Amino acid sequence: MSRSVVVITAGLSSPSSTRLLADQLADATRAAVGGRGESVDVEFVELRELAVEMAQTMVSGNRPTPGLETVQAKVVAADGLIAVTPVFTASYSGLFKTFVDLLDKDALIGKPVLIAATAGTPRHSLVLEHAMRPLFAYLRAVVVPTAVFAATEDFGGETDLERRVHRAAGELAALVVAERTGVAGFAPTGDEASGTLGPVTDFSQLLRGHDGS
């Protein structure tokens, strides 16, 4: 069964270091999924091409344009997500955040996500841990342990970028090809899966018959 991975890249130019890193992560993920005996369809989403549509959506009561709605549906349907952004002012780009803000709040629940970022210097690498990981944790996505940061000096030189790329891709592949249903008796069902707790016993009933001693 073929899996699907959507790569969201928030680079503002073409070519860009953000797209270059996204390409490397996508290639490594294809290889990692293939190594597990599965195939994967990878689709790229260049957010700069949706910038006008996202702005229109933001100022029109969050009613997405047809183009943006199509992309959102692909993200929801994907088995995994690779999210790559440049670092601006010690955080992800506004373009990237706008796209995330326009997603349904439940769109990424349980979805495997690989996070990555690019910047001019290694000093910005903590953005992955203090901005991107908390963002996707809030959205209840499953973020792979290895996040990938690439500074300008990491491209074209002898660095450990390739090793980090392949390690992160392997972690994403493991989640993407995993069974979509849990082991019998352990998978959430019914109210658990929907997040509803079900009937709640009144506290006074719990204390009935107890004298407090």
Where do the model's predicted regions map?
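N-terminal beta1-alpha1-beta2 submodule of the flavodoxin-like/Rossmannoid cofactor-binding fold
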Residues: M1-V84, A90-K97, L197-S213
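Short histidine/acidic/glycine/proline-rich micro-motifs that form metal-
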Residues: L12-P15, A119-R123, D154-F155
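Generic secondary-structure signature for well-ordered alpha-helical cores
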Residues: R30-G35, A137, A141, G170-T181
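Mobile beta-alpha loop/short-helix "lid" or hinge segments that flank ligand
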Residues: E43-M54, A137-G156
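Helix-loop-strand module that forms the ligand-binding subsite of alpha/beta enzymes
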Residues: R63-L139
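Glycine-rich phosphate/pyrophosphate-binding loop and the adjoining helix
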Residues: A147-S213
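Hydrophobic/aromatic residues located in beta-strands of well-ordered beta-sheets
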Residues: V5, V42, V113, V143-V144
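Hydrophobic alpha-helical membrane-association signature
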Residues: L21-L25, L128, A168
